[in-house]
């Protein structure tokens, strides 16, 4: 039978998700590499459907979407070109704005899934489907989109999980929430203009956040994740052809905050 090169099936994926520890009713944030999973009978959307079936209708699936076309660079443009952007660039519309391509095609698939909910922070936007999707995505502040009351904070509060499905460990978005919480020296604050819809009209607002695009020179998310795994955190398995990790969001966040503060906190020694 192995000579037939049968693609991974829906049933096989459901079994693999359950073997990893995914259970009915969980709230789960997914990071995924479709390429790493391998060929799937029916296409990549079957991965999402299999995961939702493992979670059951009582569960919730969330992914980072962001905004593919966010014009956060316009302050660096020549004045004449910036003026064109200010006049012509469309606003962020949660119903239509595309998910960031680099973060997996599955994020765009989930964005267009029936009954999807999407949070209103353009750069830190999350999409979610399931019982707690509305709770996770509601009232997402424009400033400090990975902080208090963000979808990530809510995922931690409801004791949700993070699934890394063939995705690199340096892409765990939840660790931005840990960075927000950690009392560290020299957090870099950035401000950028962003067009949003307000009462049906485009308005430009200034968004303030910690700089998530310029990671600290002295650490990486992958290093935090591997240290967490080394001390027994999470579970590891195989889904399709992909290496997969399942992390409890609350425990991973607690570990990451302690990890960051012990090295870069106010009381940490300078090395």
UniProtKB/Swiss-Prot annotation:
GO BP of this protein: 2-deoxystreptamine metabolic process; acetyl-CoA catabolic process; antibiotic metabolic process; cellular response to antibiotic
Protein family (similarity comment): Belongs to the antibiotic N-acetyltransferase family.
Highest rank taxon of the organism: Bacteria
GO molecular function terms attached to this record: aminoglycoside 3-N-acetyltransferase activity; coenzyme A binding; identical protein binding; protein homodimerization activity
Keyword Acyltransferase: yes
Principal EC category: transferase
UniProt-annotated binding residues for a 2-deoxystreptamine antibiotic: 64, 72, 102, 123, 146, 170, 176, 212-213, 221
Keywords: Acyltransferase, Antibiotic resistance, Transferase
Result of changing residue 72 to W: No effect in catalytic activity with gentamicin as substrate
One matching Pfam family: Antibiotic_NAT
Keyword Acyltransferase part of the UniProt annotation: yes
Protein name: Aminoglycoside N(3)-acetyltransferase III
Subunit text: Homodimer.
Catalytic activity from the UniProt record: a 2-deoxystreptamine antibiotic + acetyl-CoA = an N(3)-acetyl-2-deoxystreptamine antibiotic + CoA + H(+)
Known role: Resistance to antibiotics containing the 2-deoxy-streptamine ring including dibekacin, gentamicin, kanamycin, sisomicin, tobramycin and neomycin, but not to amikacin or netilmicin. Acetylates a broad range of both 4,5- and 4,6-disubstituted aminoglycosides, including neomycin, paromomycin, ribostamycin, sisomicin, gentamicin, tobramycin and kanamycin, with no preference of one disubstitution over the other. Acetylates sisomicin and kanamycin most and least efficiently, respectively. Does not modify plazomicin.
Provenance organism: Pseudomonas aeruginosa
